[in-house]
Amino acid sequence: MDNYQFSILNFQFSTVGTTVLMLAISIFLGLLLGKIKIKGITLGITWVLFVGIGLSALGVACNHDMLHIIKEFGLILFVTAVGLQVGPGFFRSFKKGGLAMNIMALVNVALGVGITVIIAKMANQELTDMAGVYTGAITNTPGLSAAQQAVGDLGIEGASERLAAGYAVAYPLAVVGMIVSCLLLRWFCRIDLKKEPTEEIQSNQNNQSTPNSTSSKKGGILLIPIFIIIALGIVLGSIPIPVGMKAPVKLGLAGGPLVVALIAGWLGVKKGWYSTEFTDGQGVHMLREVGIALFLAGVGLGAGQAFVATVQTHYMWVVYGVIITMVPPILVTLFGRLVLHLNYYTLMGFIGGSHTDPPTLAFANNVAPEGCKLPNTGYATVYPLTMFLRIFTAQLLVLMAI
């Protein structure tokens, strides 16, 4: 930790200092690039990921243990904020269209698994390798961990490393692929954003916070309930759920806090413990943005070198990953739009939630008008079930390879 790894103009930085510096540079440059629009379209905060990959590919030495902690903590902050923002209206929205959206999520997962198996057979690829590409294409780190544990239990030589390589090569373009899927859905269905309903804006304006609520103190944010939610969420996410396979399924560090935050956001407002000024205040919004920025920077800085190395030897995995990423959500959301007539902002959130992909939700929130929570609702409605299914199917692909 005390070894000096990086210097600028005779200033030397330890690996910890280098890591923090690279995180700051990744976020700073990524946010600047995110303001660039081409024909009104921008990748937004997703640029942070690619700046991080670029810096890592240049050989900047970061502390990977530190990156892992920062990445996970950023993700926890992000999903906690999303859960609090969506919570007050989540269960009402779930009753309206939650069942249909979760069935869509189930179909989306099944299509992804089916395409993965077909590619493995047609391209003569090992299914264990494709399981790694699958987890990267759906941006699901817990699924990768579950698959690695499964191959470890089965004693498959070298499979864990190949799983990680497949994940690393598919993940970066998966983030872009899901955003492109959102744009293609808009193009296919000729959606005019100016005419797209944003019901949540009106409902929020008619549901103002009570002035004497405890949440109005200190700028509308109380840290105590937030960290209680995080603590309870981590406990919930660590509870093993037996499903009759080699390893139990867990909601993980993202799924657990999200579920607890949803309940806390709904129950807290309903019981009058705090108002929507707390759950949707500037403090929670900033928590969400800081969380996603830390997460993307951590992922990029940690994956850059592995991404470049794997692309050089397994470049077709990139193509396979893009197919697994984009085909299922495009087909499912076209059905959701053309048959079920679901809102476009909700469907963008659905794409992110059904792939457990926070950057897609960040993009959707950037596209949606200020005050519209439909992307958050679509994301949170399908995320818990999707997380379970993604972890389960990652292990299933490994077991199918035996």
Regions found by a protein language model. Name each.
Residues V20-I25, T46, F50, G74, ...:
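Hydrophobic alpha-helical transmembrane segments
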Residues N3-Q5, L9, G112-L127, G166-P211, ...:
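Juxtamembrane and boundary regions of transmembrane helices in multi-pass small-molecule transporters
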Residues L29-L33, K37, V51, L55, ...:
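Alpha-helical membrane-inserting segments
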